[in-house]
């Protein structure tokens, strides 16, 4: 998910927002509001970070990470003989595919808006592109959150109820759950097309997302409540997905710690379980931190704007609301960052760190002892780690 930015003329992005710019919102502002936004030349914000390089960099890094994750998952999936071990790989692959497709559908729009140097209405006079952009952000944003929740539930069941998991968790069931998540989110995102909710151009008039406030004076009461319902439902569904993910991950960590303490007989096995438990706990906490940082600001900000009845309409005419709308823009950027971080926190970074850990221990052992058993222990650690993930 990327926010779109554009130019309302030849003026830089930040400057045109801070000066008496007659671009995106000017026709709808009052004379007083336009006067409040007028500043002397040279007083604009630093625009060094606003560039077409931003969406291009996000696209390239996201494409590389998700494509690499899909490649590794595909190779591992074909090698696995046990069907129940494929559930985790299916979830990882589906998550990477969801993030990758979401980027490919939104980022080209971002780049076109940048390079066209025009207002959104000039590029999309019918409003269909705005609807498509908002729908895409909603579908692939919520899908990523609920796929992460499904992975957390799968992991918790594999650790806390291994016998039930082995007999009931089949590959077909995993596929059905993932497909059901995607179809359910798509049905939800189509509600504005049916008249419940609305996708609108957001502040500063250069990207589209769910409207968080009531419509204008010409809209009916049912349409206004439809907007509030849809925006609130999106925020609460996102928070629900985060809650499920956090609860299941904490339950998994607790189960791993209990199992590690139970391994008191064999010292080597106990030490190995201790390392695996620590590594897995760190990864799960990293996942929770990434999800919190990337998604909590957007979801909480949406609820705050709904409660305060703040929307893009207020940003057009009330200068005191622009700070809140700018925070909302930053929150969307954080959510878009999650698509880049997902493959790393779930798969790529863990494999890199585990192999580096084994290499360091192997070289350290060469200095301390001539034993050659450590490489086997490292291979065993990776094997046990893969087993825990599945």
From Swiss-Prot:
Tissue/organ expression: Detected in kidney. Expressed in small intestine, heart, pancreas, gastric fundic mucosa, mammary artery and pulmonary vessels.
PROSITE patterns referenced in this protein's UniProt entry, alphabetically: G_PROTEIN_RECEP_F1_2
Membrane-side (Extracellular) residue stretches: 1-53, 113-131, 198-227, 308-327
Any GO MF annotation of the entry: prostaglandin E receptor activity
Record's bilayer topology term: Multi-pass membrane protein
GO cellular component: membrane; nuclear envelope; plasma membrane
TM stretches of this protein: 54-78, 92-112, 132-153, 176-197, 228-253, 284-307, 328-349
Any Gene Ontology biological process: negative regulation of gastric acid secretion
Highest taxon listed in the record's lineage: Eukaryota
Major site of localization recorded for this protein: membrane
Annotated keywords: Cell membrane, G-protein coupled receptor, Glycoprotein, Lipoprotein, Membrane, Palmitate, Receptor, Transducer, Transmembrane, Transmembrane helix
Family stated for the protein in its record: Belongs to the G-protein coupled receptor 1 family.
Summary of subunit composition and partner proteins: Interacts (via C-terminus) with MKLN1.
Protein name as it appears in the record: Prostaglandin E2 receptor EP3 subtype
Source organism: Homo sapiens (Human)
